[in-house]
A protein has these predicted regions:
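Conserved N-terminal segment of class I S-adenosyl-L-methionine
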Residues: 2-133, 232-253
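S-adenosyl-L-methionine-dependent methyltransferase catalytic module, highlighting the catalytic core
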Residues: 3, 15, 23-37, 152-162, ...
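Hydrophobic beta-strand segment of the Class I
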Residues: 95, 139-143
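Short catalytic micro-motifs in class I SAM-dependent methyltransferases
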Residues: 146-150
Length: 254
């Protein structure tokens, strides 16, 4: 199964993957029913989660029902437990909307919810993150997760995120990050898909962020809280929800 998943991820275009997943999800969820692991997003339990990864596959990380990964479940728990995201009126901009969140967020009556991406079939607005068609100070919350590692000019993208965020608002900009690396590594001469996968971890990534990612955001003007949220969750729940211990959520305030 791991080989099949890896082949599909690396050969099927992402917009088509999203469409195909609507057929596959109910079948996978029914086949893997159990009570060992739980997806906190929809509360469903399974005997195992699925493997996932464009390069090296991680075992037991992809929820069959919502298609959430470790980072999605962690973010869900943070938003649910530590913010008023689900209750207070908010204008939200969501980049590259994840299927795990899309329908839930779309149906929240308290949110004025807009999605954006260049290619996703779930995007309301087709837009370049480096040249957004939104006015200054437009959004209370911006979600932009696992996007910046794809963007050659990530500084410009960060400036645009800062521009459209309202003063007093917050953004969450998760990225794949090597916290053992002090300085971000990027090399614009690496354009081959196989080389990028080997060096950056995925065929369409252009860098590996280090611990200096947080300073990059601060240099733009954000006030950044580096939240290690798994430390606040009981170890048995970290295991049951299949979270990644030590994963940092960057909460960015304007």
């Amino acid at each position: 199964m791991k080989k099949i998943f890896k082949a599909v991820l690396n050969t099927v275009p992402r917009p088509l993957l999203i469409r195909l997943s609507y057929v596959a999800r109910p079948i996978l969820a029914a086949a893997l029913q159990g009570n060992k692991f739980t997806d906190p997003i929809d509360g469903k339990s399974f005997r195992t989660f699925l493997p996932y990864g464009y390069g090296k596959q991680r075992n037991n990380v992809l929820s069959p029902s919502t298609l959430s990964l470790e980072r999605h479940r962690l973010l869900w728990l943070y938003l649910k437990n530590e913010t008023d995201f689900f209750t207070a009126p908010k204008k939200v901009l969501h980049f590259a909307p994840e299927q795990a969140f899309y329908k839930v967020f779309r149906n929240l009556k308290n949110l004025e919810y807009t999605t954006t991406d260049l290619n996703s079939p779930l995007a309301d607005v087709k837009a370049d993150i480096c040249n957004l068609p939104f006015a200054n100070d437009s959004y209370d919350v911006i979600l932009c997760n696992h996007v910046l590692e794809h963007i050659p000019d990530d500084k410009r993208a960060m400036q645009e995120l800062y521009r459209v965020l309202k003063p007093g608002g917050f953004g969450i900009f998760q990225i794949p990050q090597d916290l053992n690396r002090e300085v971000t590594f990027e090399d614009n001469s690496i354009t081959d898909a196989k080389a990028r996968a080997e060096i950056f971890g995925q065929y369409d990534h252009v860098r590996v962020y280090g611990h200096d990612y947080f300073e990059k955001l601060r240099d733009i003007g954000f006030k950044v809280s580096e939240v290690d949220y798994t430390k606040t969750i009981a170890p048995e729940l970290v295991e049951r929800y299949c979270l990644a211990p030590g994963e940092i959520i960057p909460i960015c305030y304007k």
